[in-house]
């Protein structure tokens, strides 16, 4: 399972934002790392990395990261390894602690997620959804809602409006428009991102957006990255239908997984 945050196109996107990006690889390991920070000090950050096939490979990658950080005069290295092959049967936290790692006070990427396996048929994937999602997916058209897909960066303004509305109502900080727009400008032409838009038909025959979701695609995985919906039309649950459509489209595209990119653990409903 590959991650967009460790891909060549993500490196290009980060470089377009003015970041220094380091890409290294060796026997069973690789990483993309970005120089972050400012006047108070810089650090080298490998989002969902390094990628490694074993503990030995991970140690080699970590040594390389430390070496690059020293060259760049970074204060520390921030890592987010995800492959269980790295620590095997060992406790992941203990494995990393023995290598001098300490848990960061704030998580940048989601620490919990849900992966949807797309190996089944479309019917099997739909059957695997909760009943309410299945019902909305099959019947939402009866209420005049359709879902479109855009690879035009200018359409990102639709999502921005919903994100701002949601952030103001719920009191959280969201990703800046400039950042997401630049992601769209770099990733969309490369086939690595798309915007799903739910529209509601009006009495005048024109359709207006009521929900949107921005997704990233790696070689085999679609990441459900940023999404929001109109509060006014919340009873339609258009965001659900946007999600079901982007999942099925990922299957049609030949991808193997959909990463929902951040869910609360079942025993921690208030997890952030």
State what each model feature region is.
Residues 1-41, 82-86, 97-108, 113-234, ...:
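A conserved beta-strand-loop-helix scaffold within acyl/acetyltransferase catalytic domains
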Residues 41-107, 220-272:
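Acyl-donor binding region in acyl/amide transferases
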């Amino acid at each position: 399972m590959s991650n967009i945050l460790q891909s060549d196109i993500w490196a290009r996107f980060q470089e377009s934002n003015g970041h220094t990006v380091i890409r290294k690889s060796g026997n069973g390991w690789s990483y993309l790392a970005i120089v972050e920070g400012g006047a108070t000090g810089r650090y080298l950050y490998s989002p969902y990395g390094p990628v490694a096939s074993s503990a030995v490979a991970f140690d080699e990658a970590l040594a390389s990261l430390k070496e690059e950080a020293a060259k760049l005069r970074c204060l520390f290295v921030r890592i987010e390894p995800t492959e269980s092959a790295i620590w095997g049967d060992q406790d992941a936290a203990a494995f990393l602690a023995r290598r001098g790692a300490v848990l960061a006070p704030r998580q940048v990427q989601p620490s919990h997620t849900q992966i949807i396996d797309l190996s089944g048929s479309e019917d099997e994937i739909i059957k695997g959804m909760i009943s309410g999602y299945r019902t909305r997916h099959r019947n939402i058209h009866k209420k005049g809602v359709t879902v479109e897909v855009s690879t035009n960066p200018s359409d990102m303004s639709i999502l921005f409006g919903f994100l701002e509305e949601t952030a103001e109502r719920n009191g959280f900080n969201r990703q800046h428009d400039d950042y997401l727009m630049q992601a769209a400008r770099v990733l969309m032409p490369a086939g690595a991102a798309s915007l799903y838009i739910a529209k509601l038909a009006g009495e005048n025959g024109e359709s207006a957006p009521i929900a949107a979701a921005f997704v990233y695609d790696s070689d085999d995985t679609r990441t459900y990255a940023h999404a929001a919906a109109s509060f006014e039309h919340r009873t339609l649950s258009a965001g659900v239908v946007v999600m079901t459509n982007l999942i099925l489209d990922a299957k049609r595209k030949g991808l193997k997984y959909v990463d929902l990119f951040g869910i609360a653990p079942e025993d921690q409903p208030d997890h952030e």
